């Protein structure tokens, strides 16, 4: 769980900014979206393979440029 203590003489805006940063780094939203609905393992594997192919293709294009 992400928690932030407000420091002395710190504005609410700065505290919220620190909270948002910790929230993103902890991967709370990413985990929520991943677990929002059930995905069959076969479909999950297929998506992982296609993401991997795209990533490899982009890396290959960058090397050739």
UniProtKB/Swiss-Prot annotation:
Pfam families documented for this protein: Ribosomal_S21 (PF01165)
GO biological process: translation
Single GO MF descriptor: structural constituent of ribosome
Assigned keywords, A-Z: Ribonucleoprotein, Ribosomal protein
Record-linked InterPro entries: Ribosomal_bS21, Ribosomal_bS21_sf
GO cellular component terms, A-Z: ribonucleoprotein complex; ribosome
Ribonucleoprotein is among the record's keywords: yes
Superkingdom: Bacteria
UniProt family annotation: Belongs to the bacterial ribosomal protein bS21 family.
HAMAP family: Ribosomal_bS21
Protein name (record): Small ribosomal subunit protein bS21
Gene that this sequence comes from: rpsU
